[in-house]
Amino acid sequence: MGVLGEKAMEELLKDKIFGEYNNVSGDFKFGRNLKVGSFNTILRDVEVGNNVDIQNYVLLKPGTRIGNDCYIDSYVLSSGACTIGNNVILRYRTVIARNVIIEDNNFFTAGVKTIFLDHSAQATQNPLHIKQGSFFGDNSIIMGGITIAENCIIGACAFVNKNTEPGGVYAGIPARRLRDVREDELWYKKP
């Protein structure tokens, strides 16, 4: 991992790895093959792994950890103090709250929101834990303090406020299990 100081920033700009008008903390740590678009804000104590692509207008707050081989689309917001695993895709306007753990191979489509509150609208002490291999439809909302099990599909505009079981398709407000996920529906196994 590198630390982004003044000299490193000059090198990155020279190689066109960084776009224009970024506000990046001097202690930003990053791996190889980093690409950063324009108009991003990366605050102190943020780390990203190898082969990470950050688009435009992204905000990464303190304590954000991003693994390898991730794609962070434009207007994504991380509230900080969260962990994002390897091979995770966060599409346009996704919000990752504090106290969220996202394991490997998860896909968040546009506008997905994770919430750092429990049912009583109080900040929860328990993390939102998203296990590996799930797919989240546009504008779905995932409440804090629950676990999304492995290989789930969460439908567009779903509101998930309870733990899920592995390999299920969930939709609705509140979300409920509709059926089992088929093997050919697992996004990360597609060519």
Question: Model segments located where?
Answer:
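Flexible, glycine/small-residue-enriched loop-and-beta-strand segment within the central core
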Residues: 1-30, 35-147, 173-174, 181-182, ...
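Conserved catalytic segment of ABC-fold P-loop ATPases
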Residues: 149-152, 165-167
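Conserved G/P- and acidic residue-centered "switch" motifs that form tight phosphate/ATP-binding loops
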Residues: 154, 172
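Active-site oxyanion/phosphate-handling segment shared across diverse enzymes
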Residues: 155, 161
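Glycine-centered loop/turn positions within well-structured domains
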Residues: 158, 166-168, 176
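Short helix N-cap motif at coil->helix boundaries in the Bergerat
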Residues: 162, 179
